A protein has these predicted regions:
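PLP-dependent amino-acid enzyme catalytic core
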Residues: 1-247
């Protein structure tokens, strides 16, 4: 499975798309083709969160072996990273209604579901691509993504992360969570403006030939932990499938 930019015919490997986040032309990376065998909710019913994640990822991250994917999933979703080993506990209200608890991750936000796995996907992609530059993750947030991304990437070797948030656009708790984040490789910065302003600024950085050339001279590669990155998107799809599989 390869990925292509929405703005050109450029095709890249899943690892390349994971590392770069956004295509050089500003387009999003999307699957070159979609699998014909669509996942059936009936087939997923009763399976563990980890099994559902593997069922989704196996269609799109074919650059990794099944064993590699399962190891990453096991490292991301366990009773150390989540307070409940079911990851997303489901409670049936009646035959047609269930409640999914999305708050058992390290930051109490549902963003933990995707970002816990993204860390391992990005690290594996860096190794597979033989990328020797340090990764600098630049991420915009309106609150929950920032803390979850910081927590996921804290103290990861060869990776640094900087989160930008609107100074007046997050809750006091979210601001404290980000500002007090532990880790030697994490930074946060408040901006004047809203989330869209932060996101637009980062997209200009990602697509600036001059800025990227300067970063390359310093041995740095920019990446993103926002949903523009397939490593954030497909784990999110897996969490959606988990909730739907009980219907």
């Amino acid at each position: 499975m390869n990925f292509r930019s929405t703005r050109s015919d450029e095709c890249v490997s899943p690892s390349y798309a994971l590392l770069h986040g956004l295509a050089a032309d500003g387009g999003l990376y999307v699957p070159e083709s979609f699998p014909e065998n669509v996942l059936s909710y009936k087939d997923l019913a009763g399976k563990s969160y980890q099994d559902i994640a593997e069922a989704v990822l196996s269609h799109f991250f074919t650059n990794f072996t099944a064993e590699e994917r399962k190891q990453m999933i096991a490292s991301a979703y366990n009773d150390t990273t989540f307070r409940d080993d079911r990851i997303v506990p489901l409670h049936s209200i009646d035959t047609d209604l269930s409640i999914a608890e999305l708050f058992h991750g390290r930051t109490l936000a549902f963003k933990d579901l995707a970002l816990s796995l993204f860390t391992y996907l990005l690290t594996a992609a860096k190794k597979q691509e033989k990328e020797d530059r340090d990764i600098l993750i630049l991420t915009a947030t309106s609150g929950d993504t920032g803390k979850a991304a910081l927590e996921g990437f804290k103290d990861v070797p060869g990776t640094n992360i900087m989160v930008f948030y609107p100074s007046e656009g997050v809750s006091p708790m979210q601001k404290q969570q980000m500002q007090k984040q532990e880790g030697d490789n994490v930074k946060v910065s408040a901006i004047y403006g809203n989330f869209d302003d932060a996101q637009s600024f980062l997209k200009r950085v990602f697509t600036s030939a001059e800025v990227n050339a300067y970063a390359n001279e310093k041995g740095v590669l920019f990446s993103s932990a926002n949903s523009i990155n397939i490593g954030r998107l497909f784990p999110k799809v897996a969490s959606s499938q988990d909730r739907k599989s009980v219907v």
